[in-house]
Amino acid sequence: IGSPKLSELAKGKENVVIICSDHTRPVPSKHIIPFMLKEIREGNPDAKITLLIATGFHRATTREELVGKFGEEIVDNECIAIHDSQDMDAMANIGTLPSGAPLLINKIAANADLLVSEGFIETHFFAGFSGGRKSILPGVSSKVTVLGNHCSKFIDSPYSRTGILEGNPIHKDMIAASKMAHQKYIVNVIIDADKKVVHAVAGDAIEAHAAGCKFLQDYCQVVPKKAADIAISTNGGYPLDQNMYQSVKGMTAAEAAAKDDGILIMVSNCGDGHGGEGFYEALKNCSSPADLMAEILKVPQDQTKPDQWEYQIQCRILMQHKVIYVMCEEHRKMAQEMGFAVANDVNEALEMAIKEKGKDAHISIIPDGVSVMVKKPE
C-alpha cells in the first residue's frame, strides 16, 4: 500500500533495521519476520539486518520469550538488539516533536539506512489505535520522549480516545516521530479473540497503517442505540484481567456506552491487585478524583510521571461515574480505598446499580471491553 515492495526498498541499503514487537504483544512474528528477511535479502543479499525489539516502557524481553516469539532459528542466526528506554547513552536526538518534546530514539534505529517494522493494530484507549507509528513512539523511544507524549494535556484531550486519530495530539506526535525517524515500511496484522490473523496490511508506514485502522474500525466498532444508565464491561478475561491498572482499558468501553452519570460495573478478577504502585497511591491518597485531576493537569509535559496517564484516565471516569468492581475477594478492600464500590458477583452489582437507577434502567453489556470499539451514542 503506497510503497514499492520491500525488496525494492532494500536495494543499495547496507544497514537495515526491522523494529519488532516485544513479549507483551501477541504478534505472530515467527510467521512475519522470515518473509520480511527473505524480501530484504532478495533486494540486497549483503544487507546487515538487525531485529530491534520495541520494548517501549516495558522490561527487557528474555531469550526464552524471544525463542517463543521468533523460533530458535531466528534467535540463533539473526542479530537481535533489545531497546532500553532508560539507557540514555543508547539514544540519538533526531529533532523536536510538534508538542515541543525532544524525539530521542534508539541509535540503532536512528542510524539505519532502511527502517521498517512489524506489529499489530488494535484499539488503543488514548492513542486511538496501536501499530504503525507506535513502533517508533513509544516502541524505540527514550523514557523522556515517551513521558512527554503521555503528558496530562494530551491525555485530557477529548480526541485522545479509543478509535480516534483525527485531532488526537498523541497520534500527531507519533506520526511526526515516524516521519522524522524515516520509518519507511510496515507489516501489521489484525488478530481476533483467538489470536488468529484476520487481516494484514503492508506498505508505507502511514498509508498502510491508516488502511489497517479503517479495516479494524469496520470490524469491531459498535454504536449503541442509546446511552446506558448501567454499563457492564470486562477486560477480556485472563491474562488482561490480572490487575486494576490493566482494567482501566476495559472500563473506558463502559464509559463510552454510558450516560454521563451512568453506573459502570467492571468485571475483572484483578488477582494481582492494583498493578502499579503509583496508580494505587495516587487514587488512595487523593481527597477526591476531581482534586487529583486538578493536580495532574498542573504537571508540566517534561515532568510527567510514570503511570500518571493511567490514573488520570481513571480519575476522568470516577469524576463522572460510580464504578462497581466485581473482583477477587482478596483485593476488594484495596479497591474501596481507591474510591470504587465492590460487589461479590454480577447479580449483586446489578442490584446495587438498579437500586440507584430504577427498574427501568437501560443496561448495556460489553462482554469484552478491550477488543470492541464503542462509539458514544449521539
Regions found by a protein language model. Name each.
Residues 25-46, 247-257:
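Histidine-anchored nucleotide/phosphate-binding helix
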Residues 95-97, 107-110, 114-187, 192-193, ...:
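Conserved phosphate- and dinucleotide-binding cores of soluble alpha/beta proteins
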Residues 61-129:
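An acidic, phosphate/nucleotide-engaging active-site surface
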Residues 15-26, 50-56, 232-234:
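Short glycine-rich or small-residue beta-strand-to-loop segments that form or flank ligand, phosphate
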Residues 247-248, 252-378:
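C-terminal non-catalytic interaction/assembly regions of soluble proteins
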